[in-house]
A protein has these predicted regions:
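N-terminal non-catalytic cap/leader segment that marks the start of a structured domain
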Residues: 1-93
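Glycine-enriched loop-and-adjacent helix/strand subsegments that border the catalytic/binding cleft
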Residues: 68-149
């Protein structure tokens, strides 16, 4: 299931994505992208459809999640990260924090501080935790993961 957060005006809502947007048609040329609108926040309650359906190309997609407090990042989680920076490879993952304001939507501008000269980019995978969790065993991790983005 693909859950999106979107706006059709001032109100932000969630929906289940079906199909593709108009600018990414199927090989046949069809585009049937739509959102089945959800009630509430699927991070807090199980997804429940309202019955409303809106076309995907008629909405503005925003950040898929609203981080409730912070983003916990994992740096140098493989040998190439450490060696690429010219530093010694750490014995394990290095954690770092980012403010929740660092999470933006697909078409939102990246706002840089005045002193910054460039944007560092790389592919990232975010694991969305769907319930409070601390010191979870690897074997039990699946029970607290809501999804990926």
């Amino acid at each position: 299931m693909k859950i999106a957060r979107f706006s059709t005006g001032d109100e932000l809502r969630y929906g289940i994505v079906e199909g593709l947007p108009a600018d990414e048609p199927y090989p046949s040329g069809e585009s049937e992208g739509r959102l089945i609108v959800l009630r509430g926040d699927p991070l807090c309650t199980p997804p429940e459809a309202t019955g409303e359906i809106v076309p995907l190309d008629g909405v503005r997609l925003v950040s898929p999640v609203i981080p409730r407090s912070k983003v916990v990042g994992v740096g140098a989680n493989h040998a190439a990260d450490g060696s690429r920076a010219g530093a010694a490879v750490p014995g394990g993952p290095v954690l770092f924090l980012k403010p929740n304001t660092a999470v933006i939507g697909p078409d939102a501008p990246i706002v840089l501080p005045a002193w910054s000269r460039e944007v560092h980019y790389e592919g990232e995978l975010a694991v969305v935790i769907g319930s409070p969790a601390k010191d979870v065993d690897a074997a039990d991790a699946g029970r607290v993961i809501l999804g990926y983005t």
